[in-house]
């Protein structure tokens, strides 16, 4: 029963041009996104099975990649098709598509950026189902929040791979 249950709950994800079961997708431990947080990401909401503001997210993705000098290995149209296909394959009516592009996986860990002509970026997309958000009390009434100062740059004493 455990194997059947696990199989039924498995999502389809996208990794470097191919679709995989989430349990089958593999990323190198030398990927700079993993070792150095050298990556960009976008999250596109899905409502009624449709992507919300895909163009805005794609434009920001391209700007972010340009700013970090990471080559974009996938065209706007191809990326849109991947988003739509993941929504379809995973039967997402309400949820999100998470996208991350890293500088890739050179053969060794190094602080020097790898030559973009020698190292391909890693492209990962997956979905998350978030049913009920649009009709939730929070969506209708809003949320109470508390804001705090962002102290990440003030904590350079912590050797974290994240910002």
What kind of feature is each model-predicted range?
Residues 75-84, 94-110:
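Short, glycine/charge-rich beta-strand/loop segments that flank catalytic centers
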Residues 1-73, 77-85, 114-163:
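Helix-start/capping segments and mature chain N-termini
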